[in-house]
Amino acid sequence: MTVSSLDSLPQPLKDRLRNVRLLLLDVDGVLTDGGLYFANGGDEWKRFDVKDGAGIYLARKLGLEVGLITGKTSDIVTRRAEELGVVLVRQGAMDKVPALAELVREAGCSTAETAYVGDEVLDLPVMARVGVSA
């Protein structure tokens, strides 16, 4: 979606987008391709796209807080978050609503000022509580 195409959005959605201060993202299937890769030794791999990293960098440059909520726990996610300067991270959150409440509180904003991007059933309760979701 280009910036010029934002003109075609309904005014209430544009208003909610203008109020976003916190962008929260699921990891598997949103920042990765959703696959789980295991080496013979048991090491787990995840494939992150550099374009998503660039988007997170730009969101932070624009003044948005960015955070991650994921149902799995992985050193790889910790490393990627550190590389991107993302400090608002909750891993192992099978119930993501408490994680949402914690991160919103830490960011000093409200759920109405939060956008969330998810891709699975576990994300639906969070998506129902934030100002903007996809």
Predicted regions and their residues:
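Acidic, divalent-metal-coordinating active-site segment for phosphoryl/phosphodiester hydrolysis
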Residues: 77, 119-132
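Conserved Lys-Pro-Asp/Glu-containing loop-to-beta segment of HAD-superfamily phosphomonoesterases
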Residues: 97-124
